Amino acid sequence: MPLRASEHAYRPLGPGTPPVRARLPAAAWVGVGTIIGGVVIIAALVLVPSRASWALSPCDSGWHEFNLGCISWDPTPMEHEQAVGGCSAPATLIPRAAAKQLAAVARVQSARSSGYWWVSGDGIRARLRLVDGVGGIDQFCEEPALRICYYPRSPGGFVQFVTSTRNALGLP
């Protein structure tokens, strides 16, 4: 017995609904576009400029670059009170660690120097002997010494992020 087409035809279980198209709302597209745009802008800022453009700002006139700071000095030996008051803000007397580094460089240039430098001692008299980097505090600091003023320069957080990213990527 032959089958009729109407007997075995497909019959849906429920009323038919048109297929729903998945669409993102406009706010989601704006959010995704903003995120992608931000990533592209940061990538362009990190990758396009050279490393030199992310360097520290230059020292002021009359100051000399030293590591991440700037130094200025007076070649005339003076008393501690005069030395402390002679550095213009934001500079202070050179910190002990920076003074030791500078003394190491200065010893290379003049091994016979026996002078002293006043160093930042957090309110106490402190100085550093140039020849060997040995320091003295209070009663051992009666003689005049040279004043070396110092102010640090530090790159901002974004500059540190950029330079560390460039280092991680091996970019010059």
Swiss-Prot record:
Query: From which domain of life does this come?
Result: Viruses
- One GO location term (cellular component): virion membrane
Q: What is the membrane topology listed in the Swiss-Prot or TrEMBL record?
A: Single-pass type II membrane protein
Q: Which InterPro entries match?
A: Herpes_UL45
Which parts of the chain does the record assign to the membrane side Intravirion? 1-27
Q: Name one Pfam family in it.
A: UL45
- The residues on the Virion surface side of the membrane are 49-172
**Which keywords does this chain's UniProt record carry?**
Membrane, Signal-anchor, Transmembrane, Transmembrane helix, Viral envelope protein, Virion
Instruction: Tell me where it resides.
Output: Virion membrane
Which sequence ranges are marked TM in the entry?
28-48
Primary role: Important virulence factor of HSV neurotropism. Seems to be required for glycoprotein B-induced fusion. Dispensable for growth in vitro.
Q: Which family does it belong to?
A: Belongs to the herpesviridae HHV-1 UL45 family.
What protein name does the entry list?
Answer: Envelope protein UL45
Q: Which organism is it from?
A: Human herpesvirus 1 (strain MP) (HHV-1)
